[in-house]
Amino acid sequence: MAKDIKFSEEARRSMLRGVDALADAVKVTLGPKGRNVVLEKKFGSPLITNDGVTIAKEIELEDAFENMGAKLVAEVASKTNDVAGDGTTTATVLAQAMIREGLKNVTAGANPVGVRKGIEQAVAVAVESLKEISKPIEGKESIAQVASISAADEEVGSLIAEAMERVGNDGVITIEESKGFTTELEVVEGMQFDRGYASPYMVTDSDKMEAVLENPYILVTDKKITNIQEILPVLEQVVQQGKPLLLIAEDVEGEALATLVVNKLRGTFNAVAVKAPGFGDRRKAMLEDISILTGAEVITEDLGLDLKSTQINQLGRASKVVVTKENTTIVEGAGDTEQIAARVNQIRAQVEETTSEFDKEKLQERLAKLAGGVAVIKVGAATETELKERKLRIEDALNSTRAAVEEGIVSGGGTALVNVYNKVAALEAEGDELTGINIVLRALEEPIRQIAHNAGLEGSVIVERLKNEEIGVGYNAATGEWVNMIDKGIVDPTKVTRSALQNAASVAAMFLTTEAVVADKPEENKGGAGMPDMGGMGGMGGMM
């Protein structure tokens, strides 16, 4: 396919038009008085959102060169979202400001490489200054404040704070759509995995169709059990103790399953058989997790262990097990706390090392199951459109809160970026490097300018006053007051602000050093591919 090539000034100008198109659509959503953007969906109702990355991903421009500019800025939003989970609109605003200012200077004759060096120096100092003014997040109230600001909803803030308190900072918090109108929190204590009983005859509560085992023994094996003789010796030992048994195996079928069911129905012995969770290597890892949590040994030929010679001291214990048709929940496993802690640290290390998003998600699920439990926020709304928008906001708020727990918080509302202004301005440089530093200085003001603009105010007045205020004091655009931002709970996670600045600078530096842009030439539609003209089928009149 033929290519279209543009060079230097012409190339950068074309891309800038794309940058502006995307950034102008995204930045109207910034701040407490930000507006919404409506996105057309080919199927179903349109999506109304104020989430920067969602808007950025939807934008596709007709002109190939403009589209490349738009995609560069969309990458800033996407990368910030991946790293910090929020701050995508701020990142987009920063990137647009740096690219615009940079392009003015490069057009006027500045050397892009020198400008890039200045930008990198300024951002490094700004990031260090952000870390210095960052405060650690402590207590449920602080967590609720961060979540409330991100979701623009105090109810959501308190729900997320409660969820994190219940399952711990590493716990899995999932967000699901609810059938009702209200948004609720449901917490599953202990370890839950998605495998239910092997036979419905094993239930102890026929109304709820669930089997509840109090203080059971737990047998964990990776074998398929078909013959009752294999597990008879250990069954007899458990019967003597008068306790129920949870049997986790690759599968339990045939005579073995029938015998367990018959004994349950006769009231002789209560046992519930469950298939092992996961597949392949993940199954092996999850069985080990269960064994460590309950204090069991995994009966596997890999370790030279045989079911027939299994003793009762090789089984695990738990205070309670609840098995439904689809899930098994083990509450208060009797495993050694030191071994559980070591396993948690091992999984944490694997999370840090893995590059696969899927593997990371699965490892974090395992981590949560060992470390505390799973919380589910069930999102409710009156209409499907409102439900989608609300779910997106809650996801952002959750990511934002996790980022705050990780690296602390700074003053929100664009205040923190202006707070580091003086440190960056104190940098000594000359020539094009100084130009690069000045570009970053101008960009640091842009988020607060945009927040003020969205609230119907003059940004320059707010920025100039903010530079003279003490660190932490800022403008609350929601109420129109000057307040101590952290005291009032108007905060941003340091990680979000840092990531937005670093990613914006990275793309701006690449943009300014671009000297040629190559795109596919649009194909001309010659109209020759269709059916030949048949003259309105008039020539076929003789066939009547």
From Swiss-Prot:
Top-level enzyme category: isomerase
One GO term of the biological process aspect: protein refolding
Pfam family, any one: Cpn60_TCP1
Subcellular location, record wording: Cytoplasm
Catalytic activity field: ATP + H2O + a folded polypeptide = ADP + phosphate + an unfolded polypeptide
EC number: 5.6.1.7
SUPFAM superfamilies hit by this protein: GroEL apical domain-like, GroEL equatorial domain-like, GroEL-intermediate domain like
A GO cellular-component term linked to this record: cytoplasm
InterPro entries to which the protein is assigned, alphabetical: Chaperonin_Cpn60_CS, Cpn60/GroEL, Cpn60/GroEL/TCP-1, GroEL-like_apical_dom_sf, GROEL-like_equatorial_sf, TCP-1-like_intermed_sf
GO molecular function, a single term: isomerase activity
Keyword terms of this UniProt record: ATP-binding, Chaperone, Cytoplasm, Isomerase, Nucleotide-binding
Residues given in the record as ATP binding sites: 29-32, 86-90, 413, 476-478, 492
Domain of life where this protein originates: Bacteria
Assigned protein family: Belongs to the chaperonin (HSP60) family.
SUBUNIT field: Forms a cylinder of 14 subunits composed of two heptameric rings stacked back-to-back. Interacts with the co-chaperonin GroES.
Cited function: Together with its co-chaperonin GroES, plays an essential role in assisting protein folding. The GroEL-GroES system forms a nano-cage that allows encapsulation of the non-native substrate proteins and provides a physical environment optimized to promote and accelerate protein folding.
UniProt name for this protein: Chaperonin GroEL
Organism whose genome encodes this protein: Bacillus licheniformis (strain ATCC 14580 / DSM 13 / JCM 2505 / CCUG 7422 / NBRC 12200 / NCIMB 9375 / NCTC 10341 / NRRL NRS-1264 / Gibson 46)
Phylogenetic classification of the source organism: Bacteria, Bacillati, Bacillota, Bacilli, Bacillales
